[in-house]
Regions:
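Phosphate-binding glycine-rich loop
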Residues: 71-121, 134-139, 145
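N-terminal "arm"/small-domain region of PLP-dependent enzymes with the aminotransferase-like
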Residues: 2-67
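PLP-dependent aminotransferase class I/II
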Residues: 27, 48, 74-78, 85-89, ...
């Protein structure tokens, strides 16, 4: 068992070591970060943007041994709840998980007559990712595929109204390759 002064030394050493590691991380990103980015001068359709602050938070979370939903995630969820003016906010590990949670929640018995039921149609984009389409199928709903515009690969909003039937209960689409779809038009179709 640690004595009081040993515990104090342990905590002080832990904090000092952590600060050294974080300072080394800052120096590494400042000195070598631009070189790491310059090696790949192409413009990828997706990827990561990691600056000094993100690198520090990543290393600090690793030192806390919280690699998923630790204090940084709790802070993020609190700030998002405030930003969205909602009581709760729950983050997901990926957009794939978020899509599955969203569709599954819409199939919940807690929604009563408003829940999505087996066989209900869900409009989606023909060029959608499997992670947008799979939750529809997993919940025994019927995807109705709408063609996409080239070169954005987003849904052709003018075709949505033509696809509506009495079995259409939802629209589930994702922005394609960072290109936002016409949200205002989709909202208008959904609320009319």
């Amino acid at each position: 068992m640690l004595k009081m002064n040993q515990k104090f030394d342990y905590e002080n050493n832990k904090i000092e070591d952590k600060n050294i590691i974080l300072e080394l991380t800052r120096n590494y990103i400042r000195n070598y970060g631009p070189d790491l980015l310059a090696k790949n001068n192409s413009a990828p359709v997706s990827g990561k943007v990691v600056g000094e602050e993100e690198a520090i938070n990543l290393v600090e979370a690793s030192l806390d041994l919280w690699l998923t939903s630790g204090r940084f995630n709790k802070k993020f969820e609190k700030e998002m709840a405030i930003l969205l003016n909602t009581r709760y906010f729950l983050s997901c590990n990926s957009g794939s998980s978020a899509n599955l949670l969203a569709i599954s929640a819409l199939c919940s018995d807690q929604l009563g007559d408003n829940k999505l039921k087996e066989g209900d149609e869900v409009i989606t984009c023909a060029t959608g990712f499997p992670t947008t389409i799979n939750p529809i199928i997993q919940n025994r709903l019927v995807p109705v595929f709408i063609d996409a515009k080239i070169p954005s690969y987003n849904i052709k909003t003018n075709l949505i109204e033509k696809a509506l039937t009495n079995k259409t209960k939802a629209i589930m689409i994702a922005h394609a390759l960072g290109n936002p779809f016409d949200l205002d038009k989709i909202k208008k179709i959904a609320t009319d």
